[in-house]
Amino acid sequence: MITEAVFSAGATGIIAHAFPGPESLRSIREVDLSKEMYVVITMSHPKGGDHFKIEEFCSLALEVGATGVVAPATRPEDVARVKSLIGDLEIISPGVGAQGGDSKETIRAGADFIIVGRGIYQADNPASAAEKYMSEMDIND
């Protein structure tokens, strides 16, 4: 199974889509309960949430014992909705930077972490770009 290979290679966690259903997620989770597993609730790209069943997928993440979920920084309203459904599970949110998600708004909506890719690795100065995103996450400003 892919999950076993990923963990054997040293990964400490895995991200899995919810749409294959509970059996698939359980089989991933049971490979190594000490590893983190995040369940994709909805996607960050335009129209990325159109075919996702947010309530059902959040319930599934709770049922299988996920560490957390993936919800889009491009739609903070979805992050807030997901947060209300998952309780203490973590939310990681892609879509900050190149896709237009706002880190501060996403954290305020309930995300625990943001995911930034191109906004850092395509920057002229990736270290400065990373620092900029870090400073934006202080919601006390």
Question: Which role does the model predict for each range below?
Answer:
Residues 27-42, 80-98, 133-141:
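Alpha-helix-loop-beta-strand connector modules within alpha/beta enzyme cores
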Residues 2, 24, 28, 57-60, ...:
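A general structural detector for well-ordered alpha-helical segments in enzyme core domains, enriched
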Residues 73-120:
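A C-terminal functional module that forms or caps the active site or interfaces directly
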Residues 1-76, 88:
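Conserved anion-binding
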